[in-house]
Amino acid sequence: KYLGPHGIRVNVLSPGAVQNKQTHSVVKAYNKQVVLGKRMAHPDDISPALIFLFSEASKYVTGQNLIIDGGWTL
């Protein structure tokens, strides 16, 4: 409400776990909870959403929390 009149959009990107150097047991336990693909996200699963938020395609989007976790929080 305060920044919108100045043309400033405020959004949040909330990724779930992203595959990195987690132990096998952590990955296995996490993957059981994921609805899509039964796997942790890869960086290339997250980057398109970030590009969208930076682009003109999201020029009328503000105040949103874009959760990208493969359905883990369902």
Language-model segment annotations:
Residues 3, 49-50, 54-57:
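Conserved alpha-helical elements of the SDR catalytic core
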Residues 19, 59, 72:
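Functionally critical, cavity-lining and gating residues within the transmembrane helices
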Residues 33, 51, 62-74:
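Short C-terminal tail/terminal secondary-structure segment
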Residues 35-46, 57:
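A conserved structural motif in NAD(P)-dependent oxidoreductases
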Residues 1, 5, 12-35, 45:
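A glycine/serine/threonine-rich, flexible loop-to-helix segment
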